[in-house]
Amino acid sequence: MRAISSLAGPRALAAFGRNDIRGTYRDPLLVMLVIAPVIWTTGVALLTPLFTEMLARRYGFDLVGYYPLILTAFLLLTSIIVAGALAAFLVLDDVDAGTMTALRVTPVPLSVFFGYRAATVMVVTTIYVVATMSCSGILEPGLVSSLIPIGLVAGLSAVVTLLLILAVANNKIQGLAMVRALGMLIAGLPCLPWFISSNWNLAFGVLPPYWAAKAFWVASDHGTWWPYLVGGAVYNLAIVWVLFRRFRAKHA
């Protein structure tokens, strides 16, 4: 990343990208984060039909009605934490390599670096959401197009995850501990509103991933889901702004 000191604009962004690619394939932990969605998707595609048949045969229980919840728990919400954690570890690598210090004396402002990081997180999250849920074999037909905007809102939640990790962690060991701590908050609690039929489920809106999950559930039920996208985008952006100011103060 020393080459960044003489770069600005698009060339700096290209340098960031090359550094991310090198950093990812050299670190087994980051490689595992990249391929984890493939493993989860395979598990959902292979095991869900088996459990559906077994529960229907033995207990007369229809698991099909819970497919949106399964997709949310194993693919949508995990895409958020995987993309956010991957980006956080790459930033922590940059901190260890002195990149953040070098940025202070280059034409590249910290906002450009963060803008690149946030954009890549949103793109990666959206790709994960669309690809994994489409390949799961249990997604209701006709919902693929709705996964793109839902994936973008999930991407904003992944940016929140990135910034939460960086707000506490100063190295990858601390970052890994933060990922574990955030696991239930991101991939567990947002599933609980599924079981709450009243408007009290909106209380879970304090959790950034809730909005993408709720939008997907409503879309699966053929309801009006766009208000949850708008609300989720506004809420997540507000949190991103607050956390980014802390990030900027920490590394300015």
From Swiss-Prot:
Top-level lineage group: Bacteria
Keyword tags: Antibiotic resistance, Cell membrane, Membrane, Transmembrane, Transmembrane helix, Transport
Keyword DNA repair assigned: no
GO molecular function, one term: efflux transmembrane transporter activity
Primary location class: membrane
Cellular compartment(s): Cell membrane
Residue intervals passing through the bilayer: 31-51, 69-89, 119-139, 148-168, 176-196, 224-244
Gene Ontology cellular-component terms listed: plasma membrane
Membrane topology value: Multi-pass membrane protein
Gene Ontology BP annotations: response to antibiotic; transmembrane transport
Subunit structure: The complex is composed of 2 ATP-binding proteins (Rv2688c) and 2 transmembrane proteins (Rv2686c and Rv2687c).
Function: Part of the ABC transporter complex Rv2686c/Rv2687c/Rv2688c involved in fluoroquinolones export. Confers resistance to ciprofloxacin and, to a lesser extent, norfloxacin, moxifloxacin and sparfloxacin. Probably responsible for the translocation of the substrate across the membrane.
Full protein name: Fluoroquinolones export permease protein Rv2686c
